[in-house]
């Protein structure tokens, strides 16, 4: 039996609310918790198997979505935040004490610049967009999952109604490719 995909989806997916307007994320510290306020629901929420995203203990995947950068503000204990990996494209801000990643920001020229990556499981509020797909699924092998477990992992996602990809969803890959094409001088009509 495959280990936990993620606690938010192991027992099924709870639908979000289209009218949900955001909430607060908090780190796992017992006191003086870092608090980040999101003034928006997430988009492109998904299970991510990459090696960079923060995952709950025992989980193979993170659950991560994006919000506009201007919808994110640190509202308590900002001094406890630091960038986890300064070389990474996504500058993930984690709590120095408990290690939880509160948000990830892209500072350089990139198709996702202007969007911050967040983990809605860090919120007590309900209504966040439910996961839409699973990305970077094969990447869990690089983190120690046995290749023979992959069929079972993909079957669990399929049973949840989530398409699996070994990169991102087609819509996000199209966004990346459009950005790259435009950066190289290609122009498209009606964009």
From Swiss-Prot:
Q: Name one GO molecular function term.
A: S-(hydroxymethyl)glutathione synthase activity
Record pathway: One-carbon metabolism; formaldehyde degradation; formate from formaldehyde (glutathione route): step 1/3
Question: Which positions does UniProt annotate for Zn(2+) 1 binding?
Answer: 27, 29, 95, 98
Q: Which cysteines are joined by disulfide bonds?
A: none
State the reactions this protein catalyses.
Answer: S-(hydroxymethyl)glutathione = glutathione + formaldehyde
Q: So what EC number does this one have?
A: 4.4.1.22
Give me the residues that bind Zn(2+) 2, please.
48, 50, 53
Which residues are in the CENP-V/GFA domain? 20-166
Alphabetized InterPro entries for the sequence: CENP-V/GFA, Formald_GSH, Mss4-like_sf
Instruction: Give the GO biological process terms.
Output: formaldehyde catabolic process
Which keywords appear in this protein's UniProt record, sorted alphabetically?
Lyase, Metal-binding, Zinc
**What function does the entry list?**
Catalyzes the condensation of formaldehyde and glutathione to S-hydroxymethylglutathione.
The text of the family note is: Belongs to the Gfa family.
Q: Which PANTHER family match?
A: CENP-V_GFA DOMAIN-CONTAINING PROTEIN-RELATED, GFA DOMAIN-CONTAINING PROTEIN
Protein name from the UniProt record:
Putative glutathione-dependent formaldehyde-activating enzyme
- Native source organism of the sequence: Penicillium rubens (strain ATCC 28089 / DSM 1075 / NRRL 1951 / Wisconsin 54-1255)
Classification of source organism: Eukaryota, Fungi, Dikarya, Ascomycota, Pezizomycotina
